[in-house]
Amino acid sequence: MGMSNLTRLSEFILLGLSSRSEDQRPLFALFLIIYLVTLMGNLLIILAIHSDPRLQNPMYFFLSILSFADICYTTVIVPKMLVNFLSEKKTISYAECLAQMYFFLVFGNIDSYLLAAMAINRCVAICNPFHYVTVMNRRCCVLLLAFPITFSYFHSLLHVLLVNRLTFCTSNVIHHFFCDVNPVLKLSCSSTFVNEIVAMTEGLASVMAPFVCIIISYLRILIAVLKIPSAAGKHKAFSTCSSHLTVVILFYGSISYVYLQPLSSYTVKDRIATINYTVLTSVLNPFIYSLRNKDMKRGLQKLINKIKSQMSRFSTKTNKICGP
């Protein structure tokens, strides 16, 4: 193979969810709505938590950070996706592709570890309620937040640097709607052995570590709940955990389906499954966490009433200034 064929590609083409031109505008409308709902829903969760003193505790602290991470997570992927729906070329530069891959891995891992931190918090609240305030103090919360952020930055940097060392000399068409690791690796004409080994060892460990924490936490919760004598007490404990468990199943179920398989078997079905943990979980989180949570509902209602009041005052002042 000549040296001219080994030059680094300057851009990739993102094939997207569909190559049919008639699908592009409906998909654009659908994902624009999903993106706007994601931004609005998660932003309302953050504002409700920070404006209500009754929601100033570790559980809602982690939920507000998760909502912020979800906003960032979808923003890394969806805006470029929307542009490509209306574009004929559907290109992404090499540097932009690596940047998208990096931040996708960063916020994906932060989401994963935050779900583990929330499970630990629930475990302490249910299994050790009398020492909850002592155990889940400010220092503990900061550590549970600092570790996933620090780890996610270095974990993502490792994988992106390993991709950057590869040579792409055949096709530049990525069969995906964003620069995910596996579809990009499939384009490489140099050996991806090191990348695959790291993905199946360090990458797998980074996914399994928080998942194991969640499993252990919920096993302890289950044992503690079964010891509660009253049916009402058991129901209250289970309902407290149900929203978090729903998100965990959605997130880890789709991740396991996509990534716990050989690189060669990556197909269109994986592209669809990826939507679950990149887009759907982020848009569903505000609804899942608020629908069955009375405190969260109260906080959101209080925030909405406050916004309405401010808008009413602004409208009244505007009318006075403008006159009849």
Swiss-Prot record:
The chain crosses the membrane at residues 26-49, 58-79, 101-120, 140-158, 197-219, 237-259, 272-291. GO terms for molecular function: G protein-coupled receptor activity; olfactory receptor activity. Its main location: membrane. It is a multi-pass membrane protein. Glycans are attached at N5. InterPro entries: GPCR_Rhodpsn, GPCR_Rhodpsn_7TM, Olfact_rcpt. PROSITE patterns: G_PROTEIN_RECEP_F1_1, G_PROTEIN_RECEP_F1_2. The keyword Membrane applies. Residues 50-57, 121-139, 220-236, 292-324 are cytoplasmic. SUPFAM superfamilies: Family A G protein-coupled receptor-like. It is found in: Cell membrane. The keyword Transmembrane applies. PANTHER family: OLFACTORY RECEPTOR. Odorant receptor. Belongs to the G-protein coupled receptor 1 family. This is Olfactory receptor 1L3. It comes from Homo sapiens. The gene is OR1L3.
